[in-house]
């Protein structure tokens, strides 16, 4: 009867500028312990899954085997229960800088800007009717 909730640990994208850019989480014992505590808390809160973003691969692998909800990785190694990627990053709509794990498969952002530029050039060539 509740709302399904997916938890999120590791990098929180909305904090990238505040923390000085993209970086891996879980490199220190203190950070690893904090991630473990957060994952357990999310499990206990009833999350149906937990996103592990930009985490140390070994820590993510350990967490995947220690919590019941699936651990869905995004830049956290191949030992997670599943993988996701932000579509805008994958297709090249996100401006730089990108996280180190993102390898865009297209450059739709650049293609879109080029298309808009062509449109503007064409529009400026249309004669203006004087009233």
Q: Which residue ranges define each predicted feature?
A:
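Alpha/beta enzyme core
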Residues: 1-131
């Amino acid at each position: 009867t509740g709302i399904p909730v997916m938890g999120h640990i590791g990098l929180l994208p909305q904090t990238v500028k505040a923390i000085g850019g993209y970086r891996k989480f879980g490199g220190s014992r203190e950070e690893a312990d904090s991630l473990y505590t957060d994952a357990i808390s999310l499990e206990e809160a009833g999350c149906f899954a937990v996103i592990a973003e930009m985490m140390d691969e070994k820590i993510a692998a350990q967490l995947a085997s220690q919590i019941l909800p699936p651990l869905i990785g995004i830049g956290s190694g191949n030992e997670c229960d599943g993988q996701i990627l932000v579509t805008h990053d994958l297709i090249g709509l996100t401006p730089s800088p990108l996280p180190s794990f993102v390898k865009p498969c297209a450059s739709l952002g650049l293609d879109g800007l080029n298309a808009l530029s062509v449109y503007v050039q064409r529009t400026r060539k249309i004669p203006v009717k004087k009233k």
